[in-house]
Each structure stands twice: as structure tokens, then as C-alpha cells.
Regions:
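Rossmann-fold NAD(P)H-dependent dehydrogenase/reductase core
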Residues: 1-131, 211-219
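Intracellular terminal tails of multi-pass secondary transporters
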Residues: 195-219
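Surface-exposed beta-strand-to-loop junctions
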Residues: 3-7, 74-78, 139-143, 180-185
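Alpha-helical packing segments of well-folded alpha/beta enzyme cores
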Residues: 92, 96, 159-163, 201, ...
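C-terminal/domain-terminus segments
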Residues: 109-118, 179-190, 194
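C-terminal helical subdomain
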Residues: 141-186, 195-197
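Mobile gating loops/cap/lid regions near enzyme active sites that modulate substrate access
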Residues: 127-142
Length: 219
């Protein structure tokens, strides 16, 4: 979050890693998936400002602003801008999930399900690698003590096991278009239901990733 990083393709790195790469991979794999395959996007509760997670609320105007932030004016200071890019990228995961569900229902004979998942805060990960050293220490060692409590603070192993159950549990075989905080189904943020944003994200993602019609059954 300390400064803006870019992928080798020229896209802002948070956006490229958290959304665009997943969008491209899913589309390239759809034709090879079994008829009852499952897709789970790893999102975050930080996409919803009502969660009061201590992160700036996401702002979605157009996907290209996310891909090329330095070319677009922003009032955010550097640290705040980086954290807002993170929460907005997680909102993109929700947009992508909803749009993918709609397109699969309209354009595919397969019964592929698509859901989104919030693994919670995982102190062991490298999310805070660019934070101040004191902040990194607190996040890694102090918050790590709270994984034994009911709050949505989890070890990587626990979140990984929950994610695996989302794509293997027979009780969820036909569940699609849902969002889970751990194993609990939750509503997504008010902004996440914006159909115009969902379609804009999809269309611009096709353009940015240079996805071709012969590469995806949804084009």
C-alpha cells in the first residue's frame, strides 16, 4: 500500500492479481470444466463498508481507472489509495461472481456453480508486508492470538479448509451466486448489486485481458 506497483503487462498490481488474472483463468478453463464444476472467488468482507473493517470503502467508477490509476486523478493519499485499491479489487470479485452466474445461466448448458468467499483476516499472510514494521509485528503476532476466538480472524489452514469445503461439500452442490463469510452465508454490500458496474467490469476485463471468442464459451 506504500506506492503503486504494476504488472509486467502494465496493469496496477492489486487489480491485476486480485481480479483480472482470475477473470482470465476462469474463462480459459470453463470449456474444460466438468458439467457440475464449482468456482469460488476469494473476496473479503472489506468490500462492504458496513463491516467497519478499518479499511476505506471501495469506489468503482470504471474498470480502466483501476487498471491505470496513475493516469487518473485521485484525492487519496498514497497509503489510503493503496488500501482503497485493495477493497475495490475485492468488490470486483463480487461483481465478477454475479456476472459470471448470469452468463453461465444464459450461455452454458453446464451446471457450473459460482460463489464468493471471505476467508477473514489471516495474520500469517503477507497482506501487510509493506506496512510499518510495528504494524506488521502486531498483525502477525498479536492478532494471531485471536484465531481461537469466534471473530472472523483465522489461520491460513482453517480458511483453506473452509474454502475446500465450499467446492467439495455435497450440500452446496447446487448453490450458486452466494457469498460466504467462512461457512456462513451472508449478503454482499449494497454497491455489489449494481448491474451496470457488473457488466462494465466484465466488458472491460475482456478488453484488457485480450480474451478472444474462441477462448471462452461466454463470449
Amino acid at each position: 500500500v506504500d506506492k503503486t506497483y504494476y504488472s509486467k503487462e502494465g496493469f496496477e498490481e492489486t487489480f491485476a492479481v486480485n481480479h483480472l488474472s482470475h477473470f482470465l483463468l476462469v474463462n480459459l478453463l470453463l470449456d474444460r470444466m466438468t458439467k457440475d464444476g464449482r468456482i469460488a472467488f476469494v473476496s473479503s468482507g472489506t468490500h462492504d463498508p458496513k463491516k467497519k473493517a478499518g479499511m476505506p470503502e471501495p469506489v468503482y467508477k470504471n474498470e480502466k481507472i483501476l487498471a491505470y490509476p496513475e493516469e487518473n486523478y485521485t484525492n487519496d493519499k498514497k497509503g489510503l489509495a493503496g488500501r482503497r485499491r485493495y477493497t475495490t479489487s475485492k468488490l470486483c470479485n463480487i461483481y465478477c461472481m454475479y456476472e459470471l452466474v448470469d452468463r453461465l445461466n444464459q450461455m452454458s448448458a453446464k451446471n457450473i456453480t459460482v460463489n464468493a468467499f471471505d476467508p477473514g483476516l489471516m495474520p500469517e499472510t503477507g497482506l501487510a508486508r509493506t506496512y510499518h514494521p510495528i504494524s506488521r509485528f502486531v498483525l502477525k503476532y498479536f492478532l494471531g492470538l485471536f484465531v481461537i476466538f469466534p471473530a472472523n480472524i483465522n489461520s491460513v489452514a482453517k480458511s483453506g479448509k473452509t474454502l475446500a469445503s465450499l467446492v467439495t461439500d455435497n450440500q452446496l452442490k447446487h448453490v450458486t451466486g452466494r457469498y460466504f463469510e467462512g461457512k456462513k452465508e451472508m449478503k454482499t454490500s449494497a454497491l455489489s448489486y449494481n448491474k451496470e458496474n457488473q457488466k462494465n467490469l466484465w466488458n472491460v476485463s475482456v478488453e484488457l485481458s485480450q480474451l478472444q471468442k474462441d477462448e471462452s464459451v461466454l463470449l
